[in-house]
């Protein structure tokens, strides 16, 4: 997924965001994301315990939950009955609703999105998001993937896909075109880096999302990088903490994490909390709570790295660790996406992801449009600053 903070304009952000999470050949956001970091700003339920599997993909906001769903469902059904595009009609209804995080996927796009949340996808190994001026920018390149082998870098602009202009177009559509056909098929992308523009032919492949990476920086420091909360990622974080050397501190890197499955973020929180509240949220006005399991490591030194690309479920985790006094946060202000979306099936097989509520941190903070301010704001060499802080907590010697 991408990353940002406060999207310049919700509408443009919305659709891209929704994809940043998806890792589609490019990302996925969305549903959790879009806006981009800082200058670009590029996303269930019943709770109760750590594993409360909130599958509502966090992320959108509407004028009124059930009413919006009814309007969108009716618009799609009427369009299909008239021989028109149900998906297009649903998109227009979402636009009218004012749900800045609402998104509509056709059947194929939604299947790709859900596949990505399972940790695998067919694509070229790119994550993208919409910039404030409407361009599509690469936010991450998967190591060892087709794009990485071809020399594509984060920060490059994606100008075209098989000669289709990506400028000013929905990120969801760009992602769909990048994913395109089966593994082994080819796609020609137009790229720009500074004054250089070129075209590159990439071969699609089945790739792992690689959402959790663990690196021992020293005997006293273990860094756990989480790029998105896909299925199983929370338990992988817990396993990494259990395997860490007894006296090592943890650097939890959530920079650029556009969100994902809320339940996985809660499970990740359980790695560092010995029970207790992680977040509260409302769905259609009904209040719920999410709790950590009671077997976490509550004593190990912990520093969390965040930035403008940290959003949604990643912000939920950050807010819990910060409010509970469990970690020191370092970096820059997070994106500010504190809403919850849930899917609504539509005529013709499309799916609308609509905002049904918002979540709050243990202290009651709402993050939507505000984000989280780090305990130590830094923009220059944040990792080095984080190591220094961890050393002061006793995580290094």
Regions found by a protein language model. Name each.
Residues 1-130, 153, 168-216, 225, ...:
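Intrinsically disordered, Ser/Thr/Pro/Gly-rich linkers and terminal tails that flank
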Residues 58-63, 75-83, 144, 160, ...:
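Second-shell loop/turn segments in exported
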Residues 132-138, 223:
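PDZ/PDZ-like groove recognition
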Residues 146, 157, 186-188, 351, ...:
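Residue-level marker of beta-strand positions
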Residues 146-157, 180, 243, 320:
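A short glycine-leucine-enriched loop at secondary-structure breakpoints
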Residues 147-172, 251-253:
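Conserved PDZ fold ligand-binding element
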Residues 182-336, 341:
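Cleft-lining beta-strand/loop regions that shape enzyme active-site pockets
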Residues 329-330, 334-362:
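BRCT (BRCA1 C-terminal) domain core and associated BRCT-interaction motifs
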């Amino acid at each position: 997924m991408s990353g940002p903070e406060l999207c310049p304009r919700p509408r443009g952000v919305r659709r891209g965001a929704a994809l940043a999470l998806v890792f589609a050949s490019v990302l996925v956001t969305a549903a959790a994301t879009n806006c981009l970091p800082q200058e670009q700003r590029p996303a269930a339920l019943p709770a109760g315990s750590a594993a409360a599997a909130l599958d509502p993909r966090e992320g959108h906001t509407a004028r009124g939950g059930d009413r919006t769903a009814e309007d969108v469902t009716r618009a799609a059904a009427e369009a299909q009955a008239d021989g028109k595009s149900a998906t297009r009609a649903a998109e227009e209804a979402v636009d009218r609703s004012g749900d800045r995080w609402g998104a509509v996927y056709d059947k194929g796009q939604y299947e790709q999105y859900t596949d990505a949340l399972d940790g695998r996808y067919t694509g070229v190994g790119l994550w993208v998001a919409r910039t404030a001026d409407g361009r599509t920018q690469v936010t991450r390149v998967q190591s060892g993937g087709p794009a990485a082998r071809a020399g594509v870098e984060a920060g490059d602009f994606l100008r075209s896909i098989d000669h289709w202009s990506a400028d000013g177009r929905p990120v969801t559509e760009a992602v769909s075109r990048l994913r395109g056909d089966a593994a082994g098929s080819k796609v020609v992308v137009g790229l720009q880096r500074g004054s250089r523009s070129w075209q590159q032919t990439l071969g699609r492949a089945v790739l792992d999302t690689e959402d959790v990476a663990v690196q021992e920086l020293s005997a006293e420091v273990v860094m756990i990088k989480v790029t998105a909360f896909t299925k199983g990622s929370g338990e992988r974080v817990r396993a990494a903490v259990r395997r860490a050397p007894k006296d090592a501190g943890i650097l939890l890197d959530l920079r650029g994490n556009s969100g994902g499955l809320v339940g996985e973020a809660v499970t990740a929180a359980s790695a560092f909390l010995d029970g207790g509240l992680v977040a509260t949220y409302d769905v259609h006005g009904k209040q719920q709570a999410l709790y950590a399991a009671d077997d976490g490591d509550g004593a190990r030194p912990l520093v969390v790295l965040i930035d403008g690309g940290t959003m949604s479920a990643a912000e939920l985790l950050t807010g819990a660790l910060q409010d509970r006094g469990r970690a020191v946060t370092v970096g820059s202000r997070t994106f500010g996406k504190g809403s919850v979306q849930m899917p609504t099936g539509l005529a013709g097989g499309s799916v609308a992801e609509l905002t049904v509520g918002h979540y709050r941190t243990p202290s009651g903070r709402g993050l939507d449009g505000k984000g989280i301010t780090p305990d130590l704001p830094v923009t220059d060499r944040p990792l080095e600053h984080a190591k220094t802080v961890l050393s002061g907590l006793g995580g290094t010697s």
